Design a protein with these regions (language model features):
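Anionic-ligand binding region
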Residues: 99, 103-111, 119-132, 136-137
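Acidic/polar active-site rim loop that often engages polyanionic ligands
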Residues: 38-44, 87-88, 127-135, 178
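GST superfamily/GST-like fold recognition
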Residues: 1-19, 112, 127-129, 136-201
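Residue-level signal for inorganic ion chemistry
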Residues: 15, 60, 83, 102, ...
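Active-site-adjacent loop/tail segments of enzyme domains
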Residues: 78, 84-114
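Short beta-strand and adjoining strand-loop segment in the mid-core
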Residues: 91-97, 134-142
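N-terminal polybasic phosphate/anion-binding patch
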Residues: 1-78, 199
């Protein structure tokens, strides 16, 4: 039994489509605090700011471990934590904070190419064994009109998604192509999940 440490409807739907019916328990992790701690640790060590892949992996780890700490091994075999961020135009962004932020994101994304990173962190409940990895895919954005962007934002869909877009919903019409695993762009990579589960045995 998989316990999904995420409230993402896209991740849940992806697993269900693949024949997996997970339980869901949302973590109480303070994402900003996790990223701040990661940045401070690297700065103290004289290292560069964390990459997008390092950021999503840190968040996926924090979410999975938070849920694992309060999970009885009889309730789940594996806890799965995920987090996604879009890297575009030299910036790394998660969910937009409001409609104005989403609109500004689309001004940057329109006609451009970005990389969607999704971190995966698995914890085996019985003994705490872990497996982790990052799925990254290149996303080529179309050039929707301002009217289309306004209507899309008014739908509310992009406000709950990393990068302010989806490929499995209304936003799919504005995506010209993807190089990489489309499931990873939705929020959970099925091929990577399979490999990580195999690593755990």
């Amino acid at each position: 039994m998989i316990l999904l440490a995420s409230k993402s409807s896209g991740r849940l739907a992806t697993l269900r489509t693949a024949g997996v019916e997970p339980r869901v328990r949302v973590s109480s992790v303070d994402e900003e605090a996790v990223l701040h701690e990661l940045t401070q640790r690297r700065r103290t060590a004289g290292l560069a700011a964390p990459s997008a892949a390092e950021q999503v992996q840190a968040l996926a780890r924090a979410k999975a471990l938070d849920v694992a700490a309060s999970t009885d091994p009889q309730d789940a075999e594996v806890i799965v934590g995920c987090d996604s961020m879009l890297e575009i135009d030299g910036r790394v962004v998660g969910k937009p904070v409001n409609a104005a932020d989403a609109r500004e994101r689309w001004r940057t994304m329109s006609g451009s190419t970005g990389t969607l990173h999704t971190g995966h962190f698995l914890v085996r409940a019985v003994d705490g064994a872990i497996a982790e990895g990052v799925s990254s895919a290149t996303v080529r954005f179309g050039s929707p009109s301002q009217t289309e962007i306004d209507a899309y934002i008014a739908s509310g869909e992009p406000l709950g998604c990393a990068g302010a877009f989806t490929i499995d919903g209304l936003g799919g019409a504005f995506i010209e192509g993807i190089d990489g695993d489309p499931h990873g762009v939705v929020g959970i990579s099925l091929p990577l999940l399979r490999r990580l589960l195999a690593d755990l045995g």
